[in-house]
């Protein structure tokens, strides 16, 4: 064991080093006397059966007379919560990209042979590892077939769907609500309040419309699956790419002849083209000076 990584109500997580394999592992240590011990066993079962790039790999489960040990992949990264708090907020493009990754993980779980609901999507349970999101802490996950009968509702305030507090049946749309709350958090820097505020500026309008479609109070009014939500976020990403690729016209105008306007325009065209932004120079009138300058600068 190297050091403690963290602890919570369900146990303590340590960083361990595998001497023979020369690799680090995360080891979750849970006392068998713990009231939530069954929750730990359930988490181990979920992780053992799930194989996805966004979910940690479980290598082994061991136990002795007093403790059980979950040995899993050690993830190095920054929590989504810490990332957003450090930056203040994320751009629509960055938030949509991470949102698509979240949708893929949740859709994988929701559409498994025995569907699983995560039920506690919140920024501290997501790690950003070199731009890739990894989902951690499966304490509250439930098989969809059992979720409606789950007596005690868990969830993080601001991210949990209303039905997690009212005792109504839970389904994949419960996780969709939380994805919307995460999108809100990423683009604002704070969790949504009891009445989320939406923006009407052009650059935010569609993104906030997507968030609203996730966080409707009635499940029937939300996106009906993480897959449907992912498709909508992908459409938004495609639109953002098209907008970024649109041609722009830059006008160079001089107050008098001979002050270097033509030279500056040609230089800018050359600079943009060499740096991956193809630029076309078009002059309002023809002069031999332009051709001479272009030849000297190597511009054809």
Question: What are the functions of these language-model segments?
Answer:
Residues 202-217:
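Conserved C-terminal C-lobe helix
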Residues 31-49:
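AlphaC helix of the eukaryotic protein kinase fold
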Residues 65-79:
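Conserved short submotifs of the Hanks-type protein kinase catalytic core
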Residues 98-99:
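Activation segment signature within eukaryotic-like protein kinase domains
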Residues 104-116:
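Protein kinase catalytic-loop region centered on the HRD/HxD motif
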Residues 80-90:
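AlphaC helix of the protein kinase catalytic domain
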Residues 251-300:
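Walker A/P-loop NTP-binding active-site region of P-loop NTPases
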Residues 61:
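Activation-segment/catalytic-loop signature of the eukaryotic protein kinase fold
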